[in-house]
Amino acid sequence: YSRRFGPLEIAKAASRGEGTPFSILTNIEPDGSLVPPDHKEALRARANQLWHTDSCFKDPPALASVLSARVIAPAGGETEFASTRLGWERLPDSMRARLADTCAWHDYAHSRGKIAPHLASQRERSTLPRVRWRIRWRNPANRRDSLYIASHTCAIEGMAKEEAQELIEQLIAHATAPGHTYLHRWQPGDVIMWDNRSSQHYAVNDYF
């Protein structure tokens, strides 16, 4: 199904599913037990609680993601989505003009470092150097703009570090404001596909 939309992304180094087109998200050990809270998979799940856009730290970044629910927690574990196209359109004209030609840097290790200093392994750091993208992402098909910024965003060109981080947090909060999101409550067999160029999402990590 997903191959109809283009070449499939290969899962990154040091992840479950490495070397395949599948990223496996689980909190269950091979023996059926739950991973402890300090386990790397539990920490990665905490990192997925940050609003993010999949693979914006890669070149090329992900066009879309397809997520299928196989085994779900008895309660919790929802995924919340926000439209960054709407987020861009809701910005004041002055802010859109300011950001239109501005670029930002995206770094996998940056977002993981918010959870634990060494959550991103050395292999991940060496194979995923930070990348630069324009903050205004224009869809080549419909020419509509989106706000391409999320928790992986580590810097903005031409801005001091603290000033950039403050603006990044403000933009994420703006795009994900209450009343502008969709919360999906998973059922076994559900499949959701989304456009990473015009959305952010996060996993509600309340099942560990």
Model regions and ranges:
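Fe(II)/2-oxoglutarate oxygenase catalytic core
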Residues: 1-193, 197-208
